[in-house]
């Protein structure tokens, strides 16, 4: 189907008037401001606990009030939480953490790291924080956003991942040693998401640094997966990156595959890439034809389309949010409501849910405080204003606080049936879960900007428009400003093209009573606003790591020329025009 892609200046398809309340069980509507403050308190309880008990380890162990390294040795929770600090309005702590990361994070270490997790959490987190630095009052260097310490750190981390892509197929290994490259005995079997979840971060990095290698390897990996789809249009779960042969042939939208589909859509919007969107739409047809049953999505055999697992996985709950990005709101809401019934049954989403039996799957009863259903609620609420979506936000706050809160943060729920806890607080709780909850209850947050305000930044390559909205969240909820990808282009013609699009967009707004408020800022040193940090217990000095710490075993992935316009409301249009 022919279509046009529009750079979104709102988060999702169409921003309708928002409802500011949702009926609760007693008939009252939850107050967004009330829940916003409770979410903020949740963040600081977890964040302070990490700083006091776990930094500089990757993650907090909330039951024993200590830390451990998990996905590398990067102070991962601090990187993952950085942009959340700004979204919550804490510029002073953001500034302090930027300094701490520069002084303490080193990627020249003999560590086997997940290529997927390092990209989405470390590279994505550093890129997002880099692009938000000026807004947070950080004194940026001349040439920003095309240069800066966080950008250099992101580039260094990404270069450590490049050896993983040196395979006959161009599809990356799942694990790489940050000092030595791919280990000789490394398994060549990688999950689909571990291959197809790089285009957002790597294309951003190439655009900002001028080095095309990152975007190039990400595109090759995407295309190899596309070429490996079955005759009925489906992809499997795990593939051998040396031979290109599928090892696990289960096809679905959940664990091991999920963010591949997500990045086709988000990559298409971020890069205005018609081909990526066309690829997703073809997949979407096959997914609906073979895996979609009664607004659930099952797992099927990729070559035959026969059902292999009639289960719902909690990671699949991102799908309604993704559907909203392509304008498929009706289907998105129906599927969301199915998933919400599971939440209400258990007070969270179990990792696996047997749909015919209506109950959890053995050994998959846990809920590690995942964000996916809350993420979809945030997107859909921006698109529809349906009060049911606020109800989910309210229920999530109440459940997490009641079940998971402990003295040192929030603990993973090991079993939703009896609410037993596990001694882990994953970094995505601060990067994603809390962030999406806060944005659900904060419709006026700068992340939701619809283009009514923006900044004009002078770079060595000309004027650059930033902060107008349309942020693209990577799969770890790190927001990327799509306009930034046009700030550092070496070809002046590309800059003129962007400026023409900006002028055309704002000419559409001249008839509106409220004109765009524009402030001009120039790159270079400036004095940030002073003020006390709101953080009660900053960790200015990292604690020394103990050599006896046990690490969690590594996993490879988690269980132009075409019409281009700036959209007033932000939308991917699918039509015949």
Swiss-Prot record:
Q: Where is this region: Disordered?
A: 513-561
Q: Name one GO biological process term.
A: endoplasmic reticulum mannose trimming
Specify whether Endoplasmic reticulum is a keyword of the entry: yes
Any one Gene Ontology MF annotation carried by this entry is: mannosyl-oligosaccharide 1,2-alpha-mannosidase activity
Q: Which residues are glycosylated?
A: 90, 112, 289, 450
Q: Where is the composition biased (Polar residues)?
A: 531-540, 547-561
Swiss-Prot/TrEMBL keywords: Endoplasmic reticulum, Glycoprotein, Signal, Unfolded protein response
Tell me, using the record's free text, what induces this protein: Up-regulated by the unfolded protein response (UPR) via the XBP1 transcription factor.
Q: How is it modified after translation?
A: N-glycosylated.
Region forming the signal peptide: 1-21
Question: A Pfam family matched by this chain, by name?
Answer: Glyco_hydro_47
Q: Where in the cell is it found?
A: Endoplasmic reticulum lumen
**Which family does the UniProt entry place this protein in?**
Belongs to the glycosyl hydrolase 47 family.
Q: What is this protein called?
A: ER degradation-enhancing alpha-mannosidase-like protein 2
């Amino acid at each position: 189907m022919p279509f046009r892609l529009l750079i979104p200046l709102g988060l999702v398809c169409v921003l309708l008037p928002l409802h500011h309340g949702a009926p609760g069980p007693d008939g009252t509507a939850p107050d967004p401001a009330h829940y916003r403050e409770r979410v903020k308190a949740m963040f600081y309880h977890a964040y302070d606990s990490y700083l006091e008990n776990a930094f500089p380890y990757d993650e907090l162990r909330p039951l024993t009030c200590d830390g451990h390294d998990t996905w590398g040795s990067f102070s991962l929770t601090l990187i993952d939480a950085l942009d959340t600090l700004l979204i919550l309005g804490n510029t002073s702590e953001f500034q302090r953490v930027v300094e701490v990361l520069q002084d303490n994070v080193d990627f020249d270490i003999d560590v086997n790291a997940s290529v997927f997790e390092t990209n989405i959490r470390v590279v994505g987190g550093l890129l997002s924080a880099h692009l938000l630095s000026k807004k947070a009052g950080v004194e940026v260097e001349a040439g920003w956003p095309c240069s800066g310490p966080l950008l250099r750190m992101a580039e260094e981390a990404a270069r450590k991942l490049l050896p993983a892509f040196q395979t006959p197929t161009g599809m990356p290994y799942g694990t790489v040693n940050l000092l030595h490259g791919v280990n000789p005995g490394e398994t060549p079997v990688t999950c689909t998401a571990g291959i197809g979840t790089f285009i957002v971060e790597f294309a951003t990095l190439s655009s900002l640094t001028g080095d095309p290698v990152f975007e190039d390897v990400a595109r090759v990996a995407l295309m190899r997966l596309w070429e490996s789809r079955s005759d009925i249009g489906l992809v499997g779960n795990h593939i051998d990156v040396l031979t290109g042969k599928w090892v696990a042939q289960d096809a679905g939208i959940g664990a091991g595959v999920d963010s591949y589909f997500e990045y086709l859509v988000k990559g298409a919007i971020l890069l205005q890439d018609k081909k990526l969107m066309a690829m997703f739409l073809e997949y979407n047809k096959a997914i609906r034809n073979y895996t979609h049953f009664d607004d659930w999505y099952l797992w099927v055999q990729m070559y035959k389309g026969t059902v292999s697992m009639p289960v719902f996985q909690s990671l699949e709950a991102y799908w309604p949010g993704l559907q909203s990005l392509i304008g498929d709101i009706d289907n998105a809401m129906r599927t969301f409501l199915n998933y919400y019934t599971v939440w209400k049954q258990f007070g969270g989403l179990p990792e696996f849910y047997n749909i015919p039996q209506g109950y959890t799957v053995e050994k998959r009863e846990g809920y590690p405080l995942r964000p996916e259903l809350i993420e979809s609620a945030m997107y859909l609420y921006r698109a529809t204003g349906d009060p049911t979506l606020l109800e989910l936000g309210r229920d999530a706050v109440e459940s997490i606080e009641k079940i998971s809160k402990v003295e040192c943060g929030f603990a993973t729920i090991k079993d939703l049936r009896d609410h037993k806890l596990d001694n882990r607080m994953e970094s995505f709780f601060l990067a994603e879960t809390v962030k999406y909850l806060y944005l659900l209850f904060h419709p006026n947050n700068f992340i939701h900007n619809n283009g009514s305000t923006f900044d004009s930044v002078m770079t060595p390559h000309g004027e650059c428009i930033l902060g107008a909205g349309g942020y693209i969240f990577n799969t770890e909820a790190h927001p990327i400003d799509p306009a930034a990808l046009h700030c550092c282009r070496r070809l002046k013609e590309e800059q003129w093209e962007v400026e023409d699009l900006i002028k055309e967009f704002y000419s559409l707004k001249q008839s509106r009573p409220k004109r765009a408020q524009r402030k001009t800022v120039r790159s270079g040193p400036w004095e940030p606003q002073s003020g006390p940090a709101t953080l009660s217990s900053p960790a200015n000095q990292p604690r020394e790591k103990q050599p006896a710490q046990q690490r969690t075993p590594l996993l490879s992935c988690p269980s132009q020329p075409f019409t281009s316009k700036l959209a007033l409301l932000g939308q991917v249009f699918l039509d015949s025009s």
